[in-house]
Amino acid sequence: NKTNNIYSLYLAKEELQKQDTLLIESDLIFEDTLFHKILNNPYPNLALVAKYEPWMDGTMVRLNTENDIIDFISKKTFRYADIDDYYKTVNIYKFSKEFLRNSYVPFLEAYSKALGNNEYYEQVLRVITLLERCELKGLPLEGERWYEIDDIQDLDIAETIFAEQDQLQRYQKRYGGYWRFPKLKDFCYLVNPYFPPQKMCEELQANFNVLLREYPSGMGVNTLVMAKNFAQKLSTA
């Protein structure tokens, strides 16, 4: 039988109810300041979150204007159309003893019995956010460094972000892949600031499904179109 991290917490349910708890996943690398950030915040039940960026994967959340977490977004329910509203869970949580005892552990036990142990602990939090009285808030990061390492590529990126001696050389080795570092500004990259124009981008987006799904035009059609665009007479020889 396969198990997931919900089972790990289920095994620790008695200890969870004895005191306030910091829950940290083991595949993270992050600045020490994140500990101070979450511990010094007076709110008792917090999840560190980061505004969505293209490299992020896994569980997302939505926040209201008071930073209450109002929904957990799984991979199955993720929609690219809604990414402006998404925050990624950093997977560092602070839970009070009362929250664990009165809310999380009871739902954890019920969820595990109903759906089994091959689930994620965030699913329990998602159920709790559906209650009228939400006790869990998101605490957005403000530029602090962190990364989730799931494979060798993630490890290489994380080593680049946190490098102390040879960071420039590591970045330069990734030339052509700077888009994986959304906050990086490359002032040496030769680009045409006027291309592509906004209207062209909008036209490509509007026709993306056709461009992706249909066969490309053959040489005959492409030659005809190019001749038309450049006002050239097409030779019939």
Where are these regions (language model features)?
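N-terminal "arm"/small-domain region of PLP-dependent enzymes with the aminotransferase-like
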Residues: A163-E214
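Conserved N-terminal alpha-helix of the aminotransferase class I/II PLP-enzyme fold
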Residues: P197-A237
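Conserved core of the sugar-phosphate nucleotidyltransferase
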Residues: E31-L115
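Short, acidic Gly/Pro/Ser/Thr-rich loop/turn segments
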Residues: W55, R79, L100-N102, W146, ...
